[in-house]
Each structure stands twice: as structure tokens, then as C-alpha cells.
């Protein structure tokens, strides 16, 4: 692999020198124009359709120069380095008539020329209408990309019943998503875990509101706030390298070509909450001051009362190999999820050579959650006279203060504000961006009140092995009641305050210099970027003891409410019973010293940390056209990472006999490292419809924030360490793909990919671990666990059936399938070195299938999504491995669009028709760890475009 790197490094620097020589040998003077003393000129402009919508991925071609360019995501194009003269320019786009213009360019002048294309032409007797507009734009961008990219437009997202970006992503080949409360939260690309891929907004990496990871919560961003989704499965040197799986780029709405107004209103229903939801959206765009200033503003609001029915288990094995339930929980969740999102795009065209733009997006999600949890926890036989069937029964309610609606409030926010410029100085193009981004999670007044009953003899019913059920041997199920018949006592009364923040400052500059024109044209691109990150996690945790516990318990038991819900989806026999009212928990005046004694819980605060990270990068990229059909790109990226972390050492005092808790700052620990990352991409345009690609790239994934914190947590017989010496995970990637684009809009594609992944990270656990002379029962720490090979195959097909018979043009199919195989090598995990293990986060199979009917404004679509199970967390042995189970999602949606001046769409959708639970299992599929059900959901509404 190092030999390959050295070869590619040489190519990166030799190609810019060698290719001009090759071009001189292959071409005569008619095929290219040399750079000379003449002041160079340029042609710039924008490609739009007859409705004013921009057309990304259009091919703009000058025949006399054998030179073409591709319009960018916002429809803009530029020909630089032109000699003065007259040129015939043609514009080509799938499903549109070719547009042509003859443009005369004076010396040293930039000519602005926009093109408007007319749609609806006949292609092989198949009429391409406006119904396929979004799909057409996406495929045009994908078709002309140098690397392997999947592009999804907002119009396409609107064809599916997806309310957030995570749900939209699961429709793309090679992407699997993990869920939270029935909504897609984290995306996994090409068989890699979520922390091995990046999520960007307009090319900027999005900070994470999560405390421990770099993962971005995709359910924060409503789908209707995004113009285009780009999934770059092959990253080029001008992109951030932290994208082993790929880079998911969310392009927000750009300023329009002409006035644009849309409004959306909708509602829906969820059976768990038995309440209606609300969805609102509005977008306004226009141009002002003789089209110098462009503006696009959007707002989205969603209020979704929902919930879930959940059972969870944890298993242990005794010395004789018998499996028993160590913990058993029945949970009832009620969640109200509110999203607010605002975006603004501005651009100012100073003149034909200079433009400034601003893009900003702000997303806020409030989760008000009440959880009612009944737990049976296995008791140590030594504590109950040697009995092996005794459990502690705990009724716990989660709530918040009155200002948080007596529910646990989790407020997560992400924002990104970017100011940039594009400038043309002769033949040199220069662009820059300065941005500020922030993500935060705020949890105030998170309260828990729990009552317990010890030494309850329990039986386990294993008749349905996937749904074990525990019941008291006495036959009488202990419940909470006002008279405290069973003798429950206070177990927990706590309150937590959490504040997590990550702030990013970024600046980047890019230069692009065309060197030669003609069939062997080439250009050099280079640039630099600085990213400065600050992240901190601050938790304050307090435990309260009532001064008169008997009076408090009597008062508590006078405020009970039955939380059993008819039709509990995990099974009718799972019942949570009576719990303390959320209003009572929220109304407690815990700061009243005459009623409660407060104790700060240092063990809960031991994971607090401060982190600072600076990534300074630079790159060089050389693009060489090899005639009309071949294109080559060679490049190199250098990234210098400097990290500085500080945490805490916590000791509960048990092991040293002091019985005194301590929490001691670690001080800052710093580390720096440099990654040299070559890339080589090759594209063969066999013809206008068939595209072949091959690439070699080198990418990385930085460790999770919490893993690098140099903390030590000693809690009774257990000890946990952070690991500031963790290495970044590196990957060497080889990709091959073939795509054939149908003229009637659609494609069939196949791809192979291979990743050699070094130093992937897992949480390591060990028994009887000695630290500073003391032996601890269990130790845990993150480690670089070894290497892995990941191989995959992707196939995709999307097309209407008009090729069978014109009458079937209104019926079509969208489908894709991805197979991945991974194997861990040199597993650095004591006791598991010889285990045959897959890479964590790597499902073997993912698939999508969608059948649609579209005609005369009516759209009906059936969609299916599948992903196989995968290992999610590595345990100390295979018995403790945690797996994310396979999923099957089925949705149906319909819409009807009518009107011209006021284009109106009425829509309705039904999602999760199979009532797919979020399910984890321990070791084997029959050993359920969690089964959380959300039920079928309904939505309907109307959208109007002016």
C-alpha cells in the first residue's frame, strides 16, 4: 500500500508537467489555444429552464475549442482563459432542447450569457414532461461528476413521505440509517459506522450536538429546507478527508433566477400519542436592483406528538452456562418533537467577474419526553441469602420542571452561517469562504423519581424466546398504590442539568488556473483551509434526600397515575402500571433546604470535558482531459490535526478506604499528527450515455471526542479510562463504477468498492485489571482494535416502463441494492483475537424498491426499505456483542398537482406500514435487548407554489 502511495504522490507532481507535453504531441494548432501575451477573456452565465428553475449538471460546450464545462449545483458555468474571438456555444441537458448561441468576446472582457432551455422534447418517441423534473436534474449532476456521486433533488425527496433528511437518505444506494423515536437519526454509508462518514452543509462539516461523538443528528433538519442532497462516495483532494464511508453534503436553497414563492400546510396522526401533528413551511425568493441582489428565505415548523412502546433486556450467564435475565424493563414513552428551521441565502453580483454570497441555516429541535420505566434488576445472591431468583423491582418516572411542560426537555440546535466570494482575475478563478457553525444540546431540570421493592422472587417465561416475560412467583404483581401495600421505598430523587456545545470557525481559499484548452485541456486547482473547533460538555447532577422520608413517600403515593396503554405494541402482557404523576415530579421544590438535603453527584460529572481541535489543510489537484472521452484527476491533500483535551479523574474512595469522593482535573493533554492523502480518479465517457469511473483515494476518521479525553473514573470495583493516544482511523479506497443513462430519464448502474481500514476503534473491556496496585473487576477503555477489509457491490435501476409500451410511461421503478462483506484482521482485543468478526456498523445487505404511477398530475408511490442486521457494539466476548437487528420499512404516499399560475399539490402518506420496531439483540437474534415500537403514522397536507 505504501508503494501505491509513493507512486500516486509522484503522479500528482509529474502529471502537471507531463500532460502539457503529451498534449503538444497529440494535437495540432487547431485543437487548442496556447496561453500567450494576449489578455485573456471569459464567458460566464447561468443555465435555467423556462420556469426559471436552475439546471445543475448541464454540459456547455465550445466546439471549436473541443472544450466543455459543467454547470454547478446552482446552474452557474464559467469559461476562462479564452482568446478574444467569436465562439459558438451549445448547451445540452437530458430531456431539454439543445440551446445554441454565437458569442463574440473582446480582449480582456468577461461576457455574461445566460441560457434558457425548453423542456418537453420527444426522445425516441417518449415525451419527457415536468413530472420527472427533479429526477432529471439530479441525474444530470450525477452523470457529469468526475467521482462516484449520488444526487437527490428536493423534488425527488418530495416524491417520498420523508419529513427529515435522515429518512430521505435511506432511499439512496449504500446508505443505512439508525432510528430514534421512529425517525432516522444517523446515516451509515457503504458498510461503515456513522462516525466514519461526514455530514456537511454547503460543503462545511456540521458540528455535532451529541456529547461524545462527531455524528450529526440528521433528524434535526427538515427535508423541505434542502435544495439538493449530494452523497460523495469518492472524495477529491479539494474536499475534507474525514469521510471513509463518504461525504453527505446538504445544499440549502439558493437564491432564484426569478420570483419564487411556496407555502405548505399539513397535519397527521400518531396512534401512541393519540394526537394530531402540525407541519408548516414557507419559502420566498426573488431578485432586486436590476437582478444584482438575489434572496431566498425559508421557514419550516413541525410539531409531532408521538411516543413508543418499548421492552429492554440484558442477559448474563452463570458458571454452568445457563442464561438468565440480568435486567428486564418495560417502558412507555410519550414524546412531543418540535422542529423549527430557518434559512437565508443572499448573493450580490458586483460585476461580471466578482460575486459575493451568504448562506445561513438555523435548526432547533425541542424534545419533551416523559418516560415511565418498570425495571426488574437481578440481585447478587450474596445479598439475598444465596437465592438466584431474586430481583429488585423499580418504578421510575422521568420528568422536568414546570417551565419544561413537566417533561424532560432536550433542546438541540445546529446553525451554520457562511460568507463567501467568487472572483475571476483574468484566467485565474478564486473563491473563498468564512463560516461560523455551532451545535448545542441543552437539558435543564431533568428529573427522575424512582421507588423500589427488593427481594422479589421472579419466574421467567421463555416460551416466546424473543419476548421473555417475568412475573412474581407469588402470583401477585407488586404495584404502586396509595396505601403502599407492598412496601415500596424511595430509590432515587435526582435532577440533572446538561449543556453541550461545539463551535466551529472555518476559512477556506481555492484557486483554479486553466492551463491549456482543446481536447487535451487541463487545469490546476489548489487551496487551503483552517478549521478551529471548541467543544465542551458540562453536566451538573444532584441527588436529593427528603428530610422526612416517610411523609414524602406518603405524599408521593397520593399522586399516582396509571400509564397502561391499550394496544401496547410490544405485547399485551407487558404493562407498566401506576407511576408518580409527571406534574407532581415537576412541581417539587427541590431547592427548599427545609425539605430536602442536596448532594452533588461527582460520579455523574466525571465525564465532563473541554476539547480544542485545529485542522489545517492544503491541497493540489490537477485535472487533465484526455481527448473527448477520457478525464483524469490526480491530487494530494495534507491535513495537520492538533488536539488539546482536558477532563477529570474521579475516585469514589472505596478502593483506597478513604470513603471520600474526589474529582480532580487532569490538565490539558495535546497531540498533533499529519496525514498525507493522495487521490487518483479516472473517467471514461464511452459515449454520451455510458460512463465508467475508477479511483484510488485515501481518507480518515478522527476518534470520537469523548474517547480522547484523558479521564479516569473509578467506581467501586470498576475502572474506565479515556485514551488520548488513539490514532485516527485510515482507509485506502478503490472504487469502480459503470452507469448507463437512458434518454427517457433514468439509469442503470453497478459499482464495486474496496476499503482497507487501519486502526478502527472499539470500546475494550477486561476483567481483573490492575491499576496503581489495585485490582478492579472490570476495566473499559477505547482502543485501536485492528484492521479490516471491506468489500462491496452496488447496483441501481430507475426508469419508467415506457420502453416496453408508450402507455406504460406513467409507471416506473426505482430500486437499488448494496452488498458489503467485511472482515476484521489482527484484532487487538484480548480473548477475541481469533474471532471471525465483521466491522462494527456494517450491514451485509441494504435495499430499496419503489414502484410509482405518475400521470396528469397524479402521483402514487409504494416504497420499501431493507437493511440486514449488523454488530453495533463489541463486548468482552461474543455473548455480550450488541447487534442492530434487520429492518423492513414500507410506506405509501399519493399526491395530486394542478394549476399553472398557482401550482397546488395535495398530498397524503402512510409510513411504517409494517410497524417495524427498533430492535437490538445480544449475541444471537433470539436474545432481544430492545424492541421499541412506534406504530403506523399518517400525514396529509397541501403545498402551493406562486
What would you call each of these model-derived segments?
Residues 111-115, 165-168, 185-188, 200, ...:
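N-terminal periplasmic accessory domains that precede
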Residues 80, 205-233:
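Short acidic/polar hinge/loop motifs at secondary-structure boundaries
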Residues 166-205:
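Extracytoplasmic beta-strand/coil segments of soluble accessory domains associated
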Amino acid at each position: 500500500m505504501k508503494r501505491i502511495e509513493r507512486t500516486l504522490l509522484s503522479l500528482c507532481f509529474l502529471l502537471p508537467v507531463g500532460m502539457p507535453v503529451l498534449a503538444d504531441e497529440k494535437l495540432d494548432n487547431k485543437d487548442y489555444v496556447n496561453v500567450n501575451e494576449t489578455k485573456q477573456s471569459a464567458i460566464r452565465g447561468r443555465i435555467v429552464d423556462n420556469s426559471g428553475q436552475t439546471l445543475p449538471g448541464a454540459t456547455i460546450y465550445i466546439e471549436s475549442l473541443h472544450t466543455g464545462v459543467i454547470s454547478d449545483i446552482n446552474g452557474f458555468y464559467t469559461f476562462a482563459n479564452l482568446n478574444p474571438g467569436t465562439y459558438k456555444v451549445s448547451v445540452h441537458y437530458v430531456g431539454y432542447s439543445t440551446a445554441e448561441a454565437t458569442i463574440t468576446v473582446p480582449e480582456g472582457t468577461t461576457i455574461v450569457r445566460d441560457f434558457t432551455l425548453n423542456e418537453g422534447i420527444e426522445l425516441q418517441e417518449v415525451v419527457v414532461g415536468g413530472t420527472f423534473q427533479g429526477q432529471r436534474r439530479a441525474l444530470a449532476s450525477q452523470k457529469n461528476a468526475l467521482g462516484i456521486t449520488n444526487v437527490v433533488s428536493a423534488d425527488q425527496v418530495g416524491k417520498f413521505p420523508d419529513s427529515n433528511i435522515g429518512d430521505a437518505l435511506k432511499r439512496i444506494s449504500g446508505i443505512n440509517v439508525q432510528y430514534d423515536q421512529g425517525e432516522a437519526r444517523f446515516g451509515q454509508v457503504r458498510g461503515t459506522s456513522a462516525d466514519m462518514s461526514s455530514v456537511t452543509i454547503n460543503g462545511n462539516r456540521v458540528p455535532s450536538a451529541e456529547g461524545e461523538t462527531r455524528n450529526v443528528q440528521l433528524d434535526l433538519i427538515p427535508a423541505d429546507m434542502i435544495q439538493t442532497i449530494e452523497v460523495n462516495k469518492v472524495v477529491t483532494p479539494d474536499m475534507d478527508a474525514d469521510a471513509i464511508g463518504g461525504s453527505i453534503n446538504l445544499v440549502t436553497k439558493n437564491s432564484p433566477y426569478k420570483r419564487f414563492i411556496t407555502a405548505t400546510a399539513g397535519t397527521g396522526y400518531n396512534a401512541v400519542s393519540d394526537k394530531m401533528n402540525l407541519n408548516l413551511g414557507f419559502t420566498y425568493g426573488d431578485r432586486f436592483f436590476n437582478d444584482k441582489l438575489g434572496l431566498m428565505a425559508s421557514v419550516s415548523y413541525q410539531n409531532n406528538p408521538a411516543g413508543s412502546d418499548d421492552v429492554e433486556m440484558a442477559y448474563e450467564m452463570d458458571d454452568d452456562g445457563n442464561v438468565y435475565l440480568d435486567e428486564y424493563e418495560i417502558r412507555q414513552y410519550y414524546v412531543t418533537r418540535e422542529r423549527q428551521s430557518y434559512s437565508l441565502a443572499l448573493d450580490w453580483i458586483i460585476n461580471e467577474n466578482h460575486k459575493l454570497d451568504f448562506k445561513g441555516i438555523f435548526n432547533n429541535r425541542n424534545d419533551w419526553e416523559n418516560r415511565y420505566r418498570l425495571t426488574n434488576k437481578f440481585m447478587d445472591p450474596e445479598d439475598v441469602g444465596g437465592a438466584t431468583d431474586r430481583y429488585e423491582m423499580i418504578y421510575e418516572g422521568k420528568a422536568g420542571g414546570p417551565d419544561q411542560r413537566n417533561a424532560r426537555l432536550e433542546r438541540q440546535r445546529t446553525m451554520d452561517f457562511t460568507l463567501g466570494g467568487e472572483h475571476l482575475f483574468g484566467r485565474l478563478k478564486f473563491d473563498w469562504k468564512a463560516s461560523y457553525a455551532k451545535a448545542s444540546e441543552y437539558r435543564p431540570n431533568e428529573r427522575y423519581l424512582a421507588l423500589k421493592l427488593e427481594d422479589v422472587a421472579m419466574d421467567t417465561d421463555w416460551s416466546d424466546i424473543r419476548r421473555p416475560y417475568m412475573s412474581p412467583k407469588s402470583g401477585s404483581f407488586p404495584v404502586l398504590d396509595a396505601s403502599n401495600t407492598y412496601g415500596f421505598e424511595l430509590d432515587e430523587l435526582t435532577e440533572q442539568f446538561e449543556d453541550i456545545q461545539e463551535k466551529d470557525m472555518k476559512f477556506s481559499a481555492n484557486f483554479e488556473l486553466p492551463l491549456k484548452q482543446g481536447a487535451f485541456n487541463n487545469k490546476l486547482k489548489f487551496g487551503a483551509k483552517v478549521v478551529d473547533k471548541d467543544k465542551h460538555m458540562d453536566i451538573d447532577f444532584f441527588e436529593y434526600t427528603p428530610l422526612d422520608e416517610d411523609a414524602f413517600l406518603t405524599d408521593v403515593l397520593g399522586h399516582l397515575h396509571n400509564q397502561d396503554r391499550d394496544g401496547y405494541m410490544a405485547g399485551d402482557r407487558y404493562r407498566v402500571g401506576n407511576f408518580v404523576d409527571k406534574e407532581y415530579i415537576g412541581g417539587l421544590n427541590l431547592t427548599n433546604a427545609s425539605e430536602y438535603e442536596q448532594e452533588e453527584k461527582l460520579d455523574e460529572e466525571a465525564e465532563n470535558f473541554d476539547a480544542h481541535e485545529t485542522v489545517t489543510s492544503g491541497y493540489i489537484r490537477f485535472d487533465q482531459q484526455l481527448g473527448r472521452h477520457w478525464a483524469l484527476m490526480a491530487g494530494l491533500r495534507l491535513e495537520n490535526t492538533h488536539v488539546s483535551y482536558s477532563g477529570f479523574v474521579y475516585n469514589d474512595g472505596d478502593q483506597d478506604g478513604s470513603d471520600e469522593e474526589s474529582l480532580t482535573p487532569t490538565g490539558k493533554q495535546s497531540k498533533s499528527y499529519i496525514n498525507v492523502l493522495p487521490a487518483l480518479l479516472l473517467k471514461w465517457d464511452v459515449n454520451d450515455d455510458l460512463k465508467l469511473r475508477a479511483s484510488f483515494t485515501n481518507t480518515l476518521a478522527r476518534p470520537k471526542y469523548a474517547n480522547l479525553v484523558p479521564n479516569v473514573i473509578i467506581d467501586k470495583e470498576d475502572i474506565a479510562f479515556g485514551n488520548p493516544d488513539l490514532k485516527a482511523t485510515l482507509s485506502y479506497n478503490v472504487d469502480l463504477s459503470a452507469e448507463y443513462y437512458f434518454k427517457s430519464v433514468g439509469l442503470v448502474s453497478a459499482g464495486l468498492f474496496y476499503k482497507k481500514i487501519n486502526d478502527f476503534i472499539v470500546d475494550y473491556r477486561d476483567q481483573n485489571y490492575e491499576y496503581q496496585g489495585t485490582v478492579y473487576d472490570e476495566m473499559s477503555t477505547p482502543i485501536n482494535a485492528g484492521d479490516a477489509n471491506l468489500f462491496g457491490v452496488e447496483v441501481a435501476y430507475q426508469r419508467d416502463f415506457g420502453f416496453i409500451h408508450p402507455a406504460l410511461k406513467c409507471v416506473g421503478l426505482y430500486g437499488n441494492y448494496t452488498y458489503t462483506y467485511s472482515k476484521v484482521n489482527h484484532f487487538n482485543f484480548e480473548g477475541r483475537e481469533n474471532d471471525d468478526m465483521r466491522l462494527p456498523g456494517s450491514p451485509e445487505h441494504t435495499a430499496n424498491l419503489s414502484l410509482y404511477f405518475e400521470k396528469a398530475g397524479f402521483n402514487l408511490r409504494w416504497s420499501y426499505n431493507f437493511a440486514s442486521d449488523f454488530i453495533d457494539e463489541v463486548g468482552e466476548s461474543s455473548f455480550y456483542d450488541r447487534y442492530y437487528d434487520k429492518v423492513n420499512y414500507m410506506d405509501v404516499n399519493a399526491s395530486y398537482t394542478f394549476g399553472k399560475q398557482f401550482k397546488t399539490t395535495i398530498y397524503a402518506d402512510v409510513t411504517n406500514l409494517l410497524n417495524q420496531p427498533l430492535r437490538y439483540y445480544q449475541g444471537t437474534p433470539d436474545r432481544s435487548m430492545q424492541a421499541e415500537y412506534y406504530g403506523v403514522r399518517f400525514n396529509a397536507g397541501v403545498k402551493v407554489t406562486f
